[in-house]
Amino acid sequence: MTLKVAVQMDPIARINIRGDSTFALLLEAQARGHAISYFTPDKLSLRGNDVVASVQSLKVRDQEGDHFTLGEPARVDMRSYDVVLLRQDPPFDLAYITSTHLLERIHPATLVVNNPASVRNAPEKLFVMDFTELMPPTLISRDKDEINAFRAEHGAVVMKPLHGHGGAAVFRVLPQDINFGSLYDMFAVTFREPWVIQRFLPEVKHGDKRIILVDGEFAGAVNRVPAEDDLRSNMVRGGAAAATELSPREREICATLGPKLRERGLLFVGIDVIDGYLTEINVTSPTGIRAVARLGGPDIAAKIWDVIEAKRA
């Protein structure tokens, strides 16, 4: 089976191919003989009822510094593709949301992965609140009195922006923290939406587990251990990747989430688990494929394409 595939992503020249999951998906698609086109979100347009984009044919190579070749730009009706990979990174802003509205117009006749309507309606730090029984105590708010009441009840907390990503602007706030007032003011000026305040989990020092689900089924995992002098375990922030197995509790979390993800068309999802607590459900542009493979884990890119091909058969 040869599929016509388009990928909407950030500029390919800027990606770090060693850790980039989109690149892993493209390598696998190319190995299977699929025809790949590339475009950035700013090249997507709605002309009357037609969703079009200025795309370029794409060839990829697993060679740092020489990892891609692009063809000449061409304007294409997006309905002509079998599959579109929605893979640009957050911020989950109005530009991102608009692209999901446009791609929703071609789905499911053209299979968009992940389902753009579900991506739009499942922001990582809000969608997870559908599963509070699996989470640490969590508050979504920008009300100072509400936040202080939560801190008084739960002690040390983590405070982070609702639509942040990659570990940016994540802070631990101690029970009697003299910096809280300044931090509150900074967040109030910087972020218009509410923020996430979550009970601090000390076991994060032993790792924040990224678990990948493909079409609702467990596909692989990596434990991300923070640097000694940092709270954040994100690999882009210096976290170290380590091989791992799932605990019974983590398997229970996967079993609970799986059917909900599948029914929403969220085919490729990364969840974050600390000390048996679910903290985030990443649906926009999940990462971890290459780290899992590098540590001897399963070939998740192959699993994803197996599912995509089955849906297109």
From Swiss-Prot:
It comes from the Bacteria. Mg(2+) binds at residues 280, 282. Binds 1 Mg(2+) or Mn(2+) ion per subunit. Keywords: ATP-binding, Glutathione biosynthesis, Ligase, Magnesium, Manganese, Metal-binding, Nucleotide-binding. Its cofactor is Mg(2+); Mn(2+). GO terms for cellular component: cytoplasm. ATP binds at residues 151-207. It holds the Pfam family GSH-S_ATP. GO terms for molecular function: ATP binding; glutathione synthase activity; metal ion binding. Pathway: Sulfur metabolism; glutathione biosynthesis; glutathione from L-cysteine and L-glutamate: step 2/2. The keyword tRNA-binding does not apply. Its EC number is 6.3.2.3. It catalyses: gamma-L-glutamyl-L-cysteine + glycine + ATP = glutathione + ADP + phosphate + H(+). Signal peptide: none annotated. The keyword Manganese applies. Belongs to the prokaryotic GSH synthase family. This is Glutathione synthetase. The lineage of its organism: Bacteria, Pseudomonadati, Pseudomonadota, Alphaproteobacteria, Hyphomicrobiales.
